Amino acid sequence: MSLNKIYKNQNYFDKFEPKSMVPNINIYWKKAKDFYVWDKKNKKYVDFTSTIFVSNIGHSNPKLIKKIGDVLKNPISHSYIYYNKYRQEYVSKLIKFVNKKNLNKCFFMSSGTESTEAALKLIRLNGLKKNKEKKGIICLSGNWHGRTMGAQLLSDNQDQSKWITNKDKNIYHIDFPYPWIK
């Protein structure tokens, strides 16, 4: 199927992907560079999505492309669960960059989903460590944390979390204080 046909057929994504994965930005990206994206008519946009994969590093970052290329040329597994020189270099640079006495460990993850689930676990463990009764988690309305069960429990999107039948009674949602709205 040609890209033009896919672009014209807005139902394409609905047909082949679940509702939660259908693109919510109605721009079919043709190319991207730095913090810009272009559609099929070469209209240029600033990419304010800050979403998965590029996460504020931009598209086609030459330094990143070179570094990834260098790593991929080495025929070893590049999982974050194995020791290797790239991991050691990265940890050293990251800790030096953060430069905080009490922030001297790294916890590698491969996605925002994994990070959200780990944060949920750490929040709960920290509360229980301080006091066995500290089970509650307060979340602000309008948040979006992902598509996993834990993430959707933290989010207050009722439409996307209605499938969850055993909601956590210790997760509370409060309105975000929008000071500009009266």
Q: Where would I find each of the regions flagged by the language model?
A:
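Active-site-adjacent loop/helix segments that line or gate small-molecule/cofactor pockets in enzymes
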Residues: M1-K33, S50
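PLP-dependent aspartate aminotransferase-fold enzymes
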Residues: S92-K182
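Short beta-strand-to-turn element immediately C-terminal to the catalytic PLP-Schiff-base lysine
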Residues: W38-D39, I57-G58, A151-D156
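Conserved S/T- and glycine-rich ATP-binding loop of Class I adenylate-forming
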Residues: M1, N42, I137
